[in-house]
């Protein structure tokens, strides 16, 4: 079973240069149900308050498919889009739960720490992307964690690919590319780029969607940018549970 929890706020826009934090989370198998219920029932209202108060643009939580966890070490990915320093999280939780005491809010906030651990965080800078229908969240999202071989050349290749994918690759409902920030990207073992492929069905996700692109278009694109610019380290599959 491949599922995803997703709290999304469709009036928000991700723009070039926005910071998106990917929080890779590990939840033990016997705690998954409790963890996901906690996130929906308690963190969900706080996330909505954070968006309405301008704390961030968007927040999503996805469950990773079991067959994508091999060598990954995480079971969920939380996605924090364009988080701002103000208002404080204390103020956000007060807005979400105005009728609860500070102690009660603190208990709710701390409960999550008993249910999961953060494997690592990756701050990324949004480069480019599209959604065919901004009012609909595609059911399937595949995260490709990539190590670039020629960093700047690969970024330019993906930026140019965005319009090609949007025009010709009708099998995808959306696509995004981001670059990872921080010194960790200099490590040989670390990924430094991520692309996200979005689909409305698993049938489409399991097809070679790029085969829809005319050969002459891809040939011209490859001649301009070259090939063998990246290595996909992990291909992380997720699907939609709650929206």
Where are these regions (language model features)?
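Bacterial Sec-dependent N-terminal signal peptides
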Residues: 1-16
């Amino acid at each position: 079973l491949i599922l995803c929890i997703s709290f999304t706020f469709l009036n928000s826009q991700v723009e070039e240069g926005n910071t998106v934090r990917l929080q890779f989370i590990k939840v033990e198998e016997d705690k998954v149900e409790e963890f996901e219920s906690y996130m929906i029932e308690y963190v969900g209202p706080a996330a909505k308050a954070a968006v309405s108060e301008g704390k961030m643009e968007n927040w999503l939580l996805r469950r990773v498919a079991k067959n994508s966890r091999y060598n990954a070490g995480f079971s969920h990915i939380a996605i924090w889009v364009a988080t701002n320093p103000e208002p404080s999280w204390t103020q956000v939780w007060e807005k979400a739960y105005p009728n609860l005491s500070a102690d009660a809010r603190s208990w709710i906030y701390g409960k999550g720490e008993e249910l999961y651990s953060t494997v690592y965080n990756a701050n990324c800078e949004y480069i480019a992307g599209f959604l065919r229908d901004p009012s609909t969240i595609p059911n399937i999202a595949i995260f490709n964690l990539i190590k670039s071989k020629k960093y700047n050349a690969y970024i330019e290749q993906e930026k140019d690919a965005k319009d090609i994918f949007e025009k010709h690759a009708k099998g995808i409902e959306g696509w995004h590319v981001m670059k990872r920030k921080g010194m960790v990207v200099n490590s040989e073992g670390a990924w430094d780029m991520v692309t996200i492929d979005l689909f409305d069905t698993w049938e489409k996700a399991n097809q070679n969607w790029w085969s829809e692109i005319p050969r002459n278009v891809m040939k011209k694109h490859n001649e301009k940018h070259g090939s063998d610019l990246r290595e996909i380290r992990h291909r992380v599959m997720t699907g939609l549970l709650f929206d």
